[in-house]
Amino acid sequence: MGKNVVVLGTQWGDEGKGKIVDLLTERAKYVVRYQGGHNAGHTLVINGEKTVLHLIPSGILRENVISIIANGVVLAPDALMKEMNALESRGIPVRERLLISEACPLILPYHVALDNAREKARGAKAIGTTGRGIGPAYEDKVARRGLRVGDLFDKEAFAVKLKEIIEYHNFQLVNYYKEPAVDYQKTLDEIMAVADILTDMVVDVSDLLYKATQKGELVMFEGAQGTLLDIDHGTYPYVTSSNTTAGGVATGSGLGPCYVDYVLGIIKAYSTRVGAGPFPTELFDETGGYLREKGQEFGATTGRSRRTGWLDIIAIRRAVQINSLSGFCMTKLDVLDGLKEVKICTGYRMPDGSVIETTPLAADDWEGIEPVYETMPGWNESTFGVKEHRKLPQAALNYIKRVEELTGVPVDIISTGPDRSETIILRDPFDA
């Protein structure tokens, strides 16, 4: 049997998953997106050329890799076509390398309209969504009224279903949010224009992955966002609308959980977050600005600047537990270069003075929490582009070792730059 590897974020997303997936797909036959939508932003740099993917799996740039958008992903046809066209204009044969589950829910214009109307209505209490219709599309899925890719095989029936659901959502848009209605005919025409392109890529993903595993082919599952944004286990309600954790692999792809052999958690050497929500180690001083500028912490999807802070081991430990992590890949270590000292959060001081070492579950319970830090010496030497473990500064090695000690999880991969070549692999997940 083949070895199946999951790559996911351990923080609030933006950990650098895309590069690592691209790197490891050199050995994989399939790369599978199993949750989220085009709210993800995965940046790849190959031989100096930058590619940003939102919906298509990061394996698409590899000749011998099949990329799969599985049933757990909410699919926006317009976003997919835009991404496909951009890649095809560069000579990448996307339609030969991409497969789609017919069970993928569709994101349509009324989902986007609802998403933005709700954020506008929340005002100061806005969650900070990407405004791309992700949440409303998942709502329709759970309410069993959503349209899926498979519905496009019967265009007449699709048109009837679309009319019913647009009337349903327009009632809310117009009467409650006082926003314009979504035009039915325009929406229908747009989706019909690409219907055949989508259905031509449809495959039974669950069956395909099961047979691939039985044949010994290697499968990689590419997570989007991060553990702390999981709908169930994240800082609710400041979360995304899907299961970003390892448990989402089985439900989001149709391959049983026993077929997962290794879970790689991507851990940025410091913390970042986009949008509202708890962030105990957030920095508002010069150091926070330094991390943001040096780390180029601006969203690949929205362009929004990210909040920055020190590494939070308490939150990382939660990710270890939930995902049963096999190993870490530490990214952006080079951003810490030049700092006199680096800090790691090892506890939370509660308003009553007590110190806890677990994360609260509800967002309100995070109020008043102060981080308890362990301070370590920084390093002046550059780690950027270093490709050998022994050539890293001793202080940087000590930092990595301390993370391993505090979490009980080995750092198997270290990323020292954006290019796929700027990586130190201590243990390959496919060989672990």
From Swiss-Prot:
Keyword Magnesium: yes
Cell compartments where the protein resides: Cytoplasm
EC number: 6.3.4.4
GO molecular function annotations of the record: adenylosuccinate synthase activity; GTP binding; magnesium ion binding
Residue positions binding GTP: 13-19, 41-43, 306, 332-334, 415-417
Enzymatic reactions: IMP + L-aspartate + GTP = N(6)-(1,2-dicarboxyethyl)-AMP + GDP + phosphate + 2 H(+)
InterPro entries with a match to the protein in the record: Adenylosuccin_syn_GTP-bd, Adenylosuccin_syn_Lys_AS, Adenylosuccinate_synth_dom1, Adenylosuccinate_synth_dom2, Adenylosuccinate_synth_dom3, Adenylosuccinate_synthetase, P-loop_NTPase
Keyword Protein biosynthesis: no
Ligand binding (substrate): 300-306
Matching Pfam families: Adenylsucc_synt
Class of this enzyme: ligase
Any one GO cellular component localisation term in the record: cytoplasm
Single GO biological process annotation from the record: IMP metabolic process
UniProt keyword list: Cytoplasm, GTP-binding, Ligase, Magnesium, Metal-binding, Nucleotide-binding, Purine biosynthesis
Pathway terms, separated by semicolons: Purine metabolism; AMP biosynthesis via de novo pathway; AMP from IMP: step 1/2
Co-factor(s): Mg(2+)
Residue numbers binding Mg(2+): 14, 41
Cofactor binding note of this UniProt entry: Binds 1 Mg(2+) ion per subunit.
Binding-site positions, IMP: 14-17, 39-42, 130, 144, 225, 240, 304
Assembly and interaction partners: Homodimer.
Biological role stated in the UniProt entry: Plays an important role in the de novo pathway of purine nucleotide biosynthesis. Catalyzes the first committed step in the biosynthesis of AMP from IMP.
Family: Belongs to the adenylosuccinate synthetase family.
The protein's name: Adenylosuccinate synthetase 2
Gene: purA2
